[in-house]
Every structure is written in structure tokens, then in C-alpha cells.
Amino acid sequence: MEQNNSLPPFAQGLASPQGAMTPGLPIFSPMMPYGTGLTPQPVQNSNSLSLLEEQQRQQQQQQAASQQQGGMVGGSGQTPQLYHSTQAVSTTTALPGNTPLYTTPLTPMTPITPATPASESSGIVPQLQNIVSTVNLGCKLDLKTIALRARNAEYNPKRFAAVIMRIREPRTTALIFSSGKMVCTGAKSEEQSRLAARKYARVVQKLGFPAKFLDFKIQNMVGSCDVKFPIRLEGLVLTHQQFSSYEPELFPGLIYRMIKPRIVLLIFVSGKVVLTGAKVRGEIYEAFENIYPILKGFRKTS
């Protein structure tokens, strides 16, 4: 095909088959005048992104990362939320005036001792029946000498490796060991337990031992009371399985292990209750006030 000589020189190159079909050929001519309205364009690779597209892609990634960080409220170490969880990323906002259905996170229940209503009081005061205390005499003891020279003392090492000594006032019993440790049991109050322990230490001193009175401590208190009505122990053990055990073929009472305060209660069908395991008197009273409304709920009607 012959070139059209009537066209300008730059247009002749564009109109030729070589100029139109040759890949990579610039679409402008060095002789192109400035008044044509065409600006020389650099040759670009079609596989590479433009700078504008790259910036847009980075901005989208940053926005997605910020949304994920803002939505991850319940991070590691927190209790999983039930129903209304805030861990899911959401782009919607709550309408003004709306409140969530649950104001606090829902967590699995943990076994706790049922609390007593503040308005309800039993009006019953448990009576202390026994107090166990310990004391350190601070010296080694010859148990045979104590058993031979002291009154109301017995010692049988084949049966028990301690001297068993008793006094009448307060009516208590002491277990005296060769290491100098002593256990006093049988007192009805804290003052009686301390007084009895001092009397036993005085007896040991009079026998020629350098006994002292160190580290006196109450280890256990036992109280009892009567609620004055029969109790359905079968229903109680079914409702409070995690706290109680009841084997009438082995023991006639229900064993209830309270968590706070840490007290063990023996509950009988007649309404008698024994409380043990306390270190101070107040724990006995608190445990009974906690259990009394529960016992009323299982009162026998006939």
C-alpha cells in the first residue's frame, strides 16, 4: 500500500500498517508540533500497579486492620462471653437509647454456698460443746515419770504414745507428748480451754520439768443446736449434691460441707444440728445462720 503523501509527515507514520501494528511503537513523533494537544506518554508495563492503585490498596489494608483491632475487645485472658459477645467485628453502631439485654458478662456458674436473706434470722444460738486447743511446753518430757508421779494420769505406750491426764475444773482431758506438745480437749469456752492448759503446764512444772506456755492456739470448735422441726434429708441431699452426702446405712446424719465459712455440719432428721471445724466462735454462728433458711425449706409437714 502506498503512503498518502497528502498527509503530514507525523500522520503518515501513524497511517502506515507498520506504525499501527508494531507493538511498543511510540504514538508520537519527535516532529509533532506542540499545538496538537497530545502529550508524550512514557511506556508502562501493564502487569505493574500504578502508584495511585498501590496507595488505595494500602489504605484499605490499614482500615481493615484498625477495624479488627477495635473489635477485639475480649482479648486473651478474659472470660468467654455468652450470647452478647463483643469479640465479633461489626461495622454497625448501636442506636441511641438502646441498652444490651445483659449488663454483665454471662459466665459459667461456680458452686457457692447459698447466702442467707438479711431479713431472716433464726433466733437460735448454737451452744459450744467442745474446744480443742494446743500448746507447746518448750521442753522434752519423760512420760513415765509424769505417769508415775502425777494424779489422774495414765500412760500405755503400746496403745497411745502420750500421757492422758484429766482435771475436774474445768472438766477437760490433756494429751501430753514427749516432745513437749500438749493437746487440751473438753472445754466449753475459749477461756476454760486456756485455763485448763495452764493448769496442766503447772502440773508438769511441779514434777521438775522446765515447762513453759508457748503458742497457745484453738484448733477446733464444736457447737450444736436444735431447729425444733423434722427435716427431709433425702430432698436436701438431692438439691445440694455438691455440698452434702447422705448414707443412712452408714451414718444417720447428713454431712453438709459449707464453703464459706469452712464448716462441716451434721444434720439429723430430728432437727438436731452439729457444727464443727471452726477456729473462732463467730464461724459457728455464721454457718448456722446460712443453713437455717435451707433447713426450713425442707421441713417435714407431716
Swiss-Prot record:
Pfam families, per database record: TBP
Tissue: Enriched in testis but hardly detectable in the ovary (at protein level).
Regions of compositional bias (Low complexity) in chain numbering: 50-70
Entry GO terms, CC: nucleus; transcription factor TFIID complex
Database matches in CDD domains: TBP_eukaryotes
Coiled coil: none
Entry's localization field: Nucleus
Keyword set, alphabetical order: Developmental protein, DNA-binding, Gastrulation, Nucleus, Repeat, Transcription, Transcription regulation
First and last residues of every Sequence repeat: 128-204, 218-295
Residue numbers spanned by region Disordered: 1-22, 50-81
Record's keyword annotation contains Nucleus: yes
Any single GO BP term: DNA-templated transcription initiation
Molecular function terms from GO: DNA binding; RNA polymerase II general transcription initiation factor activity; RNA polymerase III general transcription initiation factor activity
Presence of the UniProt keyword DNA-binding in the record: yes
HAMAP family: TATA_bind_prot_arch (MF_00408)
Family under the similarity heading: Belongs to the TBP family.
Free-text function comment from the UniProt entry: General transcription factor that functions at the core of the DNA-binding multiprotein factor TFIID. Binding of TFIID to the TATA box is the initial transcriptional step of the pre-initiation complex (PIC), playing a role in the activation of eukaryotic genes transcribed by RNA polymerase II. Members of the TBP family are differentially required for transcription and development during early embryogenesis. Regulates mRNA levels in the early embryo by both transcriptional and post-transcriptional mechanisms. Required for transcription of a subset of genes at the mid-blastula transition (MBT).
Name of protein: TATA-box-binding protein
Source organism (scientific name): Danio rerio
Gene: tbp
